[in-house]
Each structure stands twice: as C-alpha cells, then as structure tokens.
Amino acid sequence: MIFSACLPISSNDSKSKNNTSAADSQKSADYKEPKVVGTIDSDEIPESSGLVNSPCQPDVLWTHNDSGDNAFVFALDRTGKKLATFKVGGAKNTDWEDLAIRKEPAGCFLYIGEIGNNARSRSEFTVYKVKEPTVSGETNSSKKNPLSTEAAEAIKFEYPDTRHDAETLLVHPATGDIYVLSKRLSGASAVYKLKAGFDSNKTNRLEKITDFTVPAIPNGLLTGGSISPDGKRVVVCDYFAAYEIVLPKQAKNFDEIWKQKPQKIELGQRAQGEAIAYAADGKAIYASSEEKDSPLIMVERK
C-alpha cells in the first residue's frame, strides 16, 4: 500500500495523543541490534507484504506481494533468495496484506490475509488457508511457470461494526484462533477474533476483543504482526519499528496479552515496513519492506 512519510495529525485528534501517552514505553531490552541478513532481490517480489518462517521447514520463509499481483506465494531461504513461486489454488489476490502459519496434525498451513480495504469499499473479507508446499531447494519456477499448491480453503468473514482496513493477521499456534488488527491513521487499532471451529460455508462474524495502541504517532497504524511459536508473545509493526507484548505468567487466557505494555524493537532502515515474523524457533524476529530489493532484517533475542 502506498504511504507518505508525512502523517497528518489534526489538532483535534486528542484521543490519538492520549492513547499514545497511555501506551508510552521504553525500548525492549530483550533484543540485540537489528542486522541485515540478506536481500529479497527477486524481480517477482517488489512488495513483500507478509512474512512467515515455517516451523515445518525452518530454513524456508514465505512471502507474498500486496494488491496488484496474482495469487502467488514465494518461498525464500534465510538470506532472502527466492527458492520457488507457487500459485495458490482457488485463491484471488485483491489486496493481500499479511501472512501467518500454523503447525497442525496434518502438517503446516499458510493463512493468507485478504484483508486490505484502503477505500473502505468492501464489507466481506477472506483468509485463505492452504497446506504449505514442500520446498526441496531452488527451483526454476516463476510467475510464468509456477508450481501449484493444493486448493485453498476460503474462510470468509465480516466485522461486527464497520468496514475496516487491516494489514495484520495472526493465528494462535495452539488454539487456531484467528486475529485481525485494524489499521488506523488516527486512534487505536481494534483487535478482532474469529474462534477456531469457524464455518467455511458461510460468512463468519468477528468478535471485537479490545482496542490496542503502540508507543508511536500514529498509534494504531499497524502493518503486520506475528504470534511467537510458544503462543506467549505478539509482535506487531508499523512502517518504522516493531512492538512486542508478552503474556503474563498468571494470565488466565491469551486475550489478556492485549492489556500489556508494548516494548519497542528497533528494526533499522526500512523504506515501508509491512511484514514481520517470529523465527521458527522463536529466538529472533524477521522483517521485510514493501520495496524492490528489500533488505531482510533479523533481530535476535539476547
């Protein structure tokens, strides 16, 4: 999605400013300095909009482009080199914005968020769930000659209140619950949930859990996110940095995580950061940017 670095904050936007103050936090002490570990230099990937590291294939990362592309996902190695291009069976890319992955009894599954709505013109959205293909090394596949995934399951949903734009999709590794976080230029992001056991034969209605802010201005302009493999941490990003929240040990359920104070994680220079993911072992975070030859950034836990 096109973005200008000049963000207008109106004089009457006191709610946004108050939320920023409430969410103010210091830089996380849990992570080392960010480092560039490679470059996503394939001409087929000019806008890396979603990113995951596979728990079934730890040496493989997956990404996709933003709107304007066909229904492709791309396998990368851990330096950003493209290994394969896959066409997702039965899927359409109107505005893909984020990517999640979950290890299930039948294998690992990619969850692709058809959740963008910049013009607020859509009321129904889709998360495509497709079994992760096996990647055995670099292939000669391309957009003109792609490999194929199995047919994707289309999980349709609507919001309970209004037509949101969103760029953050999360799937809990243990429960399979799906979370969508709205993207707002002014005010808090809204956290929505679709409990596991959803019906793919109908349009499911999300449940609003809470509002959520990060220590930035704007404080709800979220562009990507990920849940850690152990299900105890969430990282989200805006265009410039990342923010992590941690589930308290005494928490009775996962949704208590949204009440926690975000800690900022520096990601270094990104032209337009829209993708972030925990490493498969949970010991690092990967990030990319919507730009040609995007750097692949890694931030390791101390």
List PLM regions with ranges:
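Sequence/structural signature of beta-propeller domains
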Residues: 7-302
